[in-house]
From Swiss-Prot:
Positions annotated with a glycan in the UniProt record: 64
Alphabetical keyword list: Early protein, Glycoprotein, Signal, Virion
Induction record: Expressed in the early phase of the viral replicative cycle.
GO CC, alphabetical: host cell endoplasmic reticulum-Golgi intermediate compartment; virion component
Family that this chain belongs to: Belongs to the asfivirus MGF 110 family.
Pfam families for this protein: v110 (PF01639)
Protein name in UniProt: Protein MGF 110-4L
Localization (cell): Virion; Host endoplasmic reticulum-Golgi intermediate compartment
InterPro entries given in the database record: ASFV_fam_110
Signal peptide: 1-28
C-alpha cells in the first residue's frame, strides 16, 4: 500500500513540476536530458555542459536568455542527471553528487560560479 501511495505521490510531483512522466516519472542517468526538461535541470545546476551551446570558445545558455555569454572553461562540467520517484540527482563524474527532492529543488550553482569567466569583447 505504501509503495502505491509513493508511486502516486511521485507522479503528482512530476505533474506539479511540469516534468514529463515518461517511464513512470523516472529518468535513467544521462548527460543528455530531454529537451523539454532542460529548463528544470539547468535552473538548479547551470554549470552542466548540456545547458550551454558553445562555438569558438564562447558559450550561450540554452535556457536562460538573461545569462551572460561565458568563455568555455572549467566552469562547465560534464554532468549526468537522473530521477527516481521524487529524488533528482546530479552527478559531476568526479565523485560529487547533488541529491534533492524533485518537488523541493535546491540550486547547486555556487561552488561552480567561482570558475565562471564572463565573456567581454576585449577577450577576443
Amino acid at each position: 500500500m505504501l509503495v502505491i501511495f509513493l508511486g502516486i505521490l511521485g507522479l503528482l510531483a512530476n505533474q506539479v513540476l511540469g516534468l514529463p512522466t515518461q517511464a513512470g516519472g523516472h529518468l535513467r542517468s544521462t548527460d543528455n536530458p530531454p529537451q523539454e526538461e532542460l529548463g528544470y535541470w539547468c535552473t538548479y545546476m547551470e554549470s552542466c555542459k548540456f545547458c550551454w551551446e558553445c562555438a569558438h570558445g564562447i558559450c550561450k545558455n540554452k535556457v536562460n536568455e538573461s545569462m551572460p555569454l561565458i568563455i568555455e572553461n572549467s566552469y562547465l562540467t560534464s554532468c549526468e542527471v537522473s530521477r527516481w520517484y521524487n529524488q533528482c540527482t546530479y552527478s559531476e563524474g568526479n565523485g560529487h553528487y547533488h541529491v534533492m527532492d524533485c518537488s523541493n529543488p535546491v540550486p547547486h550553482n555556487r561552488p561552480h560560479r567561482l570558475g565562471r569567466k564572463i565573456y567581454e569583447k576585449e577577450d577576443l
